[in-house]
Amino acid sequence: MIPDDLRLAQVDMSEYGLPQKRKRIILLGLSKDYFGENAVELLNRFYNELLPTYKRRRMSVGEAIGDLPRLLPLRDSVDKKISHALAETRNCPSDHEPRFHNARDTAVFQMLAEDIRSGRNEFSSIESLKRLYTSLTGRQSNIHKYHVLKSDEPSNLIPAHLFKDGLRHIHPDPEQARSITIREAARLQGFPDDFQFCGSQGDKYKMIGNAVPPYFSKLVAEALHELLKDC
């Protein structure tokens, strides 16, 4: 048995301390053969009483990734494979290197991030971002291709599509002028820094985007334990 009204099962994980706006349906199924008529009551208790007790204050992008070493654009890229380098040599967690960005994208990222930081907000509307994309590429798009993360807000959704490009996950610091690294995506998805990802860079981004955030999974497990311990 699952809830009759699936709206009951929809959660925004940013309300549970994940630094990301991630809405998902979390289904809890209970066997009527085992729980009998209590199944309905238990489901309502899980969604209405227990799970909401694990809500936390919203965490921002800045809180989640702001302490990571800065990665600044190089004046000249290296073999069209490396476009950024660490600004300092302090300890750096694994997978904290950005994908390669060409000079055009680096300039666009810097401009858009500075537009937000300065408060000008010339590119705050969807239409202005569409026009920018067309002016740069000569192509039309029904959706805006660029999005800068805001330091004082949770991130937008971290999707599996991130393996294709990072245009919708631009770092908020204009001086870094880049999209987010694997480690930054992992932090926004609730992975600890000692979690190791295997495969190519694209595989790692896809793995992170497809994951159920482990931090949120732990909260669901704790709420479920509370529900079942007295059954």
Region locations from a protein language model:
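Class I S-adenosyl-L-methionine
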Residues: 1-136
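C-terminal target-recognition/interaction regions appended to catalytic cores
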Residues: 77, 81-231
